[in-house]
Amino acid sequence: MNEEMKMTQEREGRILEAAIDTWGSEMQIVVAIEEMSELTKALTKYIRADDAATISVSIREEMADVGIMLNQLSLIFGDTTEEEIRKLNRLRR
């Protein structure tokens, strides 16, 4: 991993930890639920919509929000690497 990427990840970690410290774990869990709901809504619109290009932008924005919140949830509940490996191994079968 290059030095710039490592610095970016460290900075992101500090930002995420600051958000948890400022608003608390419980509130960040609520925000994660809200962001996942917004992604669900955007995906549903994509399936039903005629203007897929516009909805695709919204989906990418919501995916970014959910990704950030998943990173915060990892800080709150712990790393999911082992679970992800198990799930990927099951998919491979």
Residues of each region from the PLM?
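Flexible "arm" and connector segments at domain edges
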Residues: 1-93
